[in-house]
Amino acid sequence: MSTVTITDLARENVRNLTPYQSARRLGGNGDVWLNANEYPTAVEFQLTQQTLNRYPECQPKAVIENYAQYAGVKPEQVLVSRGADEGIELLIRAFCEPGKDAILYCPPTYGMYSVSAETIGVECRTVPTQDNWQLDLQGISDKLDGVKVVYVCSPNNPTGQLINPQDFRTLLELTRGKAIVVADEAYIEFCPQASLAGWLTEYPHLAILRTLSKAFALAGLRCGFTLANEEVINLLMKVIAPYPLSTPVADIAAQALSPQGIVAMRERVTQIIAEREYLIAALKEIPCVEQVFDSATNYILARFKASSAVFKSLWDQGIILRDQNKQPSLSGCLRITVGTREESQRVIDALRAEQV
């Protein structure tokens, strides 16, 4: 009699799945963590809700209303979830039939679009960006048949640039009546003028992902948002867990989204942008750095001579960067989160010492 292992019982697509390599999963024993695009220092909050004996609201009113006001949309156009990552998955679960429909995304970009689709058993199609990392609209048009959700990250992670707004409009026209277009705006606080939130009334098939993990300095909270028209939100509400946000998470999120919380966030953004420009200028003068790319975010992508050796050398010194070599068109590239001035100086000094 053949022995069936536990792994044999698992779904085939799960057996074949490569999990997303998050910064924490990749590990390292560093003291300068510049690999996850987090804010470099902790922001303090006091819990005000002492009702942990009760289940939380599914969509906490204060969080939804505060975020709607901040984003300039109606409360019924907002869904809150466990990070934007849950929003990515909810959109696939609501709109894609496993084994029939597909998602489409444009590498090099964020890795969770493919992981979420593959976990659910939904086909992934890719249309690599052009040499300038802008959308290949003809390539997308050629592959749209059977696609239900298109993910576009803007500013794009890991390249750091904004997608041309006219290309977004063309994409939204191409997909009208066919697919949901998801603009992943995880880093939009660093370039708020580029948000598509004002386009929701014009495009019923547009959804926007947001997070408190970056400019709001709350990566450990796991709190994200989907902005979309009410019809889309109602469908997502059918597939979301009954209690996606714990009471402490909702409590802190509401405080972070208060008027004073928004002011504090904008002060952090100003500080990070100034530090980003300092680091970009310094990187351009370092011999082992071949190219530094413009950034609209809190991280910098740069191409290095002997990038793998540079990555390991800094890793061994406790400076943890993000290796992008395996991403399409990013050979030799490392991504550096913008941290404190002290952290920037550690990176600069370590890179200057590299022998190339």
UniProtKB/Swiss-Prot annotation:
Its cofactor is pyridoxal 5'-phosphate. Belongs to the class-II pyridoxal-phosphate-dependent aminotransferase family. Histidinol-phosphate aminotransferase subfamily. InterPro entries: Aminotrans_II_pyridoxalP_BS, Aminotransferase_I/II_large, HisP_aminotrans, PyrdxlP-dep_Trfase, PyrdxlP-dep_Trfase_major, PyrdxlP-dep_Trfase_small. It is an enzyme of class 2 (transferase). It catalyses: L-histidinol phosphate + 2-oxoglutarate = 3-(imidazol-4-yl)-2-oxopropyl phosphate + L-glutamate. Gene3D superfamilies: Aspartate Aminotransferase, domain 1, Type I PLP-dependent aspartate aminotransferase-like (Major domain). One of its GO terms (molecular function) is histidinol-phosphate transaminase activity. GO terms for biological process: L-histidine biosynthetic process. Keywords: Amino-acid biosynthesis, Aminotransferase, Histidine biosynthesis, Pyridoxal phosphate, Transferase. PANTHER family: HISTIDINOL-PHOSPHATE AMINOTRANSFERASE, HISTIDINOL-PHOSPHATE AMINOTRANSFERASE-RELATED. It comes from the Bacteria. Pfam families: Aminotran_1_2. The modification N6-(pyridoxal phosphate)lysine is found at residue 214. The gene is hisC. This is Histidinol-phosphate aminotransferase. The lineage of its organism: Bacteria, Pseudomonadati, Pseudomonadota, Gammaproteobacteria, Enterobacterales. The keyword Transferase applies. Its EC number is 2.6.1.9. The keyword Amino-acid biosynthesis applies. Homodimer. Pathway: Amino-acid biosynthesis; L-histidine biosynthesis; L-histidine from 5-phospho-alpha-D-ribose 1-diphosphate: step 7/9.
